[in-house]
Amino acid sequence: MELKDILAISGQPGLYRFIAQSRNGFIVESLLDGKRMNASASSRISTLTEISMFTEGEDIPLAEVFTKMYAYTEGKQGPSTKEGNARLKEFFGVVIPDYDRERVHDSDIKKAVSWFNLLVGAGMTKFEIPEE
């Protein structure tokens, strides 16, 4: 499983693995429960390689954020998203100290940590963006 095959679908919880293309969109499999569904072509779908986080300098790809989280947690999951915004911001501030505190909202941090935990729970250990 590579990061380029992992999708975030607007309005749907969790992350999805790309399975195949269908007439009306994509067939995807949930990383949460393993169920397959059809994601219509009109849905807002993003691969995780297309997403980046705001920092004080250059924006950094989500893959780099996940790599830093993985190194910091030593291969374990990060804090639970139920621990509250203060704990998640503290964790994120240690992992990405120069993130833009004005443009990165609490919900963005919560989603990034949630996705990281989901990927680690699914056995993903390398968060690299493949060369084109």
Positions of predicted regions on the chain:
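C-terminal charged interaction modules
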Residues: 87-132
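Eukaryotic low-complexity, mixed-charge intrinsically disordered interaction/regulatory segments enriched
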Residues: 71-76, 83-86, 94-98
